[in-house]
């Protein structure tokens, strides 16, 4: 708003917006951020799912919904032990992405898909990801037992 653009109201600044983030979640988010940065350098995707340091999925052309559905369908033998951390979905803008017209977006449907995939939460690059209906996202995260974290 300070610059005259209402879009900034949709781009949360850093902080935990719902739930609680553990040290394991912090480590998974750092790993996912590194993966997403690497994906961005070759213009592949804006998201990754990481659990206990293991990459379970990366976002590509089919998008976030398809990626999270794929994680939900993983057999238990291919998933890390949920007792040691459920993992997270991380989303960020690609390096060099035109932030005037092409920002990544999250919304309530993303949280529902993350919960269906058995994840512990959703983290995203603070100030660079549009959050549609943030009050509903916060409420829904609480209802679903997820954290929602704008990672700075």
PLM regions and their residue ranges:
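Conserved mixed alpha/beta catalytic, RNA-binding, or beta-rich assembly cores of soluble enzyme
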Residues: 1-111
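C-terminal binding/interaction regions
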Residues: 108, 112-151
């Amino acid at each position: 708003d300070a610059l005259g653009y209402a879009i900034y109201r949709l781009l949360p600044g850093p902080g935990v917006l719902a739930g609680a983030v553990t040290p394991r979640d912090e480590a998974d988010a750092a790993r996912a951020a590194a993966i997403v940065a690497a994906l961005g350098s070759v213009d592949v995707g804006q998201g990754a799912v990481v659990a206990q340091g293991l990459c379970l999925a990366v976002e590509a052309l089919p998008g976030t919904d398809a990626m999270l559905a794929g994680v939900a369908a993983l057999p238990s033998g291919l998933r890390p032990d949920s007792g040691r951390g459920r993992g997270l979905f991380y989303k960020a803008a690609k390096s060099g992405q035109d932030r005037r017209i092409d920002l990544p977006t999250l919304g309530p449907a993303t949280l529902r898909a993350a919960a269906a995939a058995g994840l512990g939460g959703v983290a995203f690059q603070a100030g660079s990801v549009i959050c549609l209906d943030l009050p509903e996202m916060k409420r829904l995260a609480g209802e679903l037992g997820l954290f929602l974290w704008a990672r700075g």
